[in-house]
């Protein structure tokens, strides 16, 4: 593998030399160049946070999957490390697909899916997927240990292992597609990272509901266990499931040796255009943190012209509130704040310019919804992004319009039935993330404003809106 890693690193360095920065993020993790998708192997290990990710170092297009690697002390300022894994062995010939990382008695261990195309590359109707192990004593350079788990009889799609240690055993959840083309998550138990046996199917889709459940994660938070996964093949329903693929959670009760007793239905984790394959880790202080890929399959990728593609969301702390899994930005984001601009309370009618040129910012605003009678009101960035309250529809709308990049359309969530609406909005060069009422809902989307279209404004149309409080920070 050493030669393949060297070639991958060399290709990445050559591509990095011509990377453009028009839309390259200031405070989100993105590849130094090349392609990025799923976050992998999120872990706090030996005093640093590690984020691995699906990566093609040779181009800004999806290719044979490698594992990129970055480390941080605060989950915000990332240092890119050497490419961690490169495909090419008999068990991962066509890709080192997604997986997780654990601390095995001081050894940083990666458990990942080895992907093999049995016919043409890219034809996923005839593939073989197995689970593999790689280990490192310094946390940077990894040695492959080979295949440690093969799929059950009759299962071809078998990927994205998430591993943890509990009750004296190793546990693993894996996404799968059964013989009837229904998604499911399999639960395994191990005496070591090399010795596994199947416990049972932890959860599965209803017949015809979705054909594959990718990137599962399983953890306790608050009063419930949460199965987090990314189903493929769900049909749109009203305002729901509008992206090509979804990501969300099932809540229930579980303990080692028991079944997962569901307590509700599948709930999406994010309602924007771009959120997929979230993975969790425990922070140094025990907070449960998730990060996701902030893109969507089959969406336009304008940054390819700048030799890079893909980024991750802000790290988010998840917590349970009234039986729902909520998200808020990790408190470390406050360290990014620089220039502070308080916003005075105002009865807004028309447009109020906040700043002429936003590269990276956090906007915190509170609206008095009961006395805000405008047809719609909120924020806008240039001519291409609006996030607003639609009083007639009773919804919060995230609308983006970049026709030159092939992007147009909106996503939305129901307007909370509260007297006050608090929005915490993070803008980076090519992304927006909105947190509604301290994590009650989130919306994440990629945006592509031109240099002359970064004016940030508040507005109210066809009536007044009452802003009760607000602050704008520039971020670095």
Curated annotation (Swiss-Prot):
Checking InterPro entries in the record gives: ConA-like_dom_sf, GH32_Enzymes, Glyco_hydro_32, Glyco_hydro_32_AS, Glyco_hydro_32_C, Glyco_hydro_32_N, Glyco_hydro_beta-prop_sf, Suc6P_hydrolase
The entry's keywords: Glycosidase, Hydrolase, Plasmid
Q: Which GO terms describe its molecular function?
A: beta-fructofuranosidase activity
The EC number(s) given in the record are 3.2.1.26
Q: Does the keyword Translocase apply?
A: no
Return the protein name. Answer: Raffinose invertase
User: Quick check: keyword Hydrolase in the entry?
Assistant: yes
**Where do the catalytic residues lie?**
38
Transmembrane residue ranges: none
List positions binding substrate.
35-38, 54, 97-98, 159-160, 214, 297
What are its GO cellular component terms? Answer: cytoplasm
Catalyzed reaction equations: Hydrolysis of terminal non-reducing beta-D-fructofuranoside residues in beta-D-fructofuranosides
PANTHER family xref list = BETA-FRUCTOSIDASE
Give the family per the record: Belongs to the glycosyl hydrolase 32 family.
According to the record's subunit comment, the protein's assembly and interactions are: Homodimer.
Give the UniProt record's GO annotations in the biological process aspect: carbohydrate metabolic process
> What is the documented function of this protein?
May prevent the potential hasard of excessive sucrose accumulation.
Q: Which PROSITE patterns match?
A: GLYCOSYL_HYDROL_F32
